[in-house]
Amino acid sequence: MEKFGKYMITLLFFSTIFSYALAQKKPNVVIILTDDMGYSDLSCYGNPLINTPFIDGMAKRGVLATNFVTTSPTCSPSRASLITGRYCTRTDLNWPVGPGEKPCLKDSEVTIAEMLKPAGYATACIGKWHMGDYGTALPNKQGFDLFYGMLYSHDYRAPYVQTDTVIKIFRNTRPEIYRPEDTTLTDLYTKESIKFVNSSAQKKRPFFLYLAYNMPHLPVALGAKKSGLHSAGGALGNVIEDMDHSMAKLWQALERNGQADNTIFIFTSDNGPWLNAPKRMFEDGITQAYHIGTAGIFRGSKGISYEAGHRVPFIIYYKGHTLVNTVIRTPLSNIDMLPTIADWAQAKLPAYTLDGESVKDLLSIKNYHKLHKPIYYVNRVLEGVKEGDWKLRITTNDGKKLKEMYNLSEDPAERVNLYDNPVYKTEQEHLVMLFDQYPG
């Protein structure tokens, strides 16, 4: 009996060790989100002046997508969709939210952080939040153990925005830095991210880091004055190259901790460049139109449901899982991130309707072919739908409806409107049907 007892204790001990070892194999997740970055703002996406060696290197290690879109062309809605896997009309955040404004991210929404926490993940939101500044909308109430950053954009100050709110860097719910200098933001966020990685690795916990940089959202002129920045791409290039250098430091921290090979690395932007920025953004005497990013051949701007507002850089790397040095031209969207992460992490999905789909197989299997379900473009209200190569856009201006249809494989710049062209009647009828079936 004594021997049997010892045997059971030994078995229990090794079972515990085995279970713990399995827990450590859960992949870490790092999502790096830039602000208002244009499709063509990185050297790996064709920019001839801005040098981004780190992110270019990650694209060579993994996958670069040329047809990745955000489901909304503005900040708060896009971020809400990314972090919940749902269209913004479900989350109640269909427009950028200001200080104290309603609505904000609903308590009933399940974020990536809330999905991963039951699986033992440490979670951190570092950088720009912009999904609500009170109550249950705060990051610590949305599944994040740590919040370090600001609740809005860094332009929420005079002369850019007329508000009584003072920009602050918070540590969880307590202000820590008042009126932070633009030159310090990227460094502050990166250092805090490295601390979080170090701490999680020491505790042997899988972790989720959501790192949302403020740049290159206007203004960039002040941030670009940081010592040591001399990009051929000017002020815009300075802040982007600064982020690239900072991401390299973060990756080195992952390597030092032996975590790089077990980390899902995702890089993207919340929406396209603010090419139609209002006059107030230029009243500081130093901001120039050429400080705004570019969207290459794509038409439109942030805040507009043409491709430039939605189509953004997307790079993903997960050693041994993602394809290597591969360009994917299949349509993808930011709402696909939550289900894809759940698939890799074997996390339980939220018990309600998700709009995104897991694209793990597309990112992992060479020559994988499966039609992505329709992707909807929501700009406060539903304005478009894309399936495969075809996109339908329906907008209302002064009570008049404008209906547009484009074959994006042949006309990515959306120059030739094929709506009501009898040659494409079948495609038009199909897209109109999909538009009317918007699930959000």
What are these model-derived regions, one by one?
Residues 9-17:
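Bacterial N-terminal signal peptides
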Residues 2-7, 22-397, 401-404, 408-440:
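Formylglycine-dependent sulfatase
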